[in-house]
């Protein structure tokens, strides 16, 4: 066989061997798997010998994505110091106004009581607030109303409101007589009737004028229309249910005894004594019972009427005696207006100062950029290498 024939025969067998058969496909798969198994242990280098250079900064994409959110945050940070500074300035004006108002009310408390004008209307309450006035007339004890419960010295009780008929105008007004314990709410359970349930027709009562306030939206309203109990002093509702003028009068704190004086005795006393006062105070000797209507003379052992008692001193009770007897404890002549505007002023100005500092820090950080550029990174690396290498 010639050389040419041998080559052609080898080529033909090579072509025939390349034709895929069932056994050939299995062998090729096995060879490929074994070859991959051979190359798995080879570790290639991870060093990028030719790094990709670009002029694009990593900050570009992040700035585009977060530009809208940053604008909102910066807008709020700019607005916060301005708004808080304005509110602080507004509290300065409020502080001046409240200080003048409290000073004016304290000045009114120093004035002597005067008779309430006949033409007094609810619109005048603001100008007459904390002014002492004298009301002459009689109480309607069968129309008493209560606000509470309220605690006093750890004891449960209520504020007592009683309608009052004026002698000069016949007008029906509402007087807050004071605090009374829960056990003495019923009139039959009270003692010292000349103080707890005065029945005089021409009684004089010293009160403070207070402007009526409406019930707040978050305060409880009275659910039972037939009840005489309110949770809060809703003067308009109380006046409407009792037919009174919507004006709030608060009886003053008074622990002194005010015995009933007959009309002829009052006229005789006015002739013999040139000094006149709002109440006629009488002295009782130590043997005199407080609740009784008569006293016993130590010399004659005979009972004496109120008109025969000495009048040079005054009996004065304490609060505990009034609580046990069921006598309402009036309001002390003090100002209850709160003045917290100085605290609000410091709070708003402090918030303005702190928010300004945060804004300056945020602007400085935004100016430097959130991500380090390639040039800055290269400079930092060279600086580090010179220092430690």
UniProtKB/Swiss-Prot annotation:
It comes from the Eukaryota. Residues 1-71, 363-389 are mitochondrial matrix. One of its GO terms (molecular function) is unfolded protein binding. GO terms for biological process: mitochondrial cytochrome c oxidase assembly. Keywords: Membrane, Mitochondrion, Mitochondrion inner membrane, Transmembrane, Transmembrane helix. Required for efficient assembly of cytochrome c oxidase in the mitochondrial inner membrane. Involved in a step that couples MSS51-COX14-dependent regulation of COX1 translation to early steps of cytochrome c oxidase assembly. This is Cytochrome oxidase assembly protein SHY1.
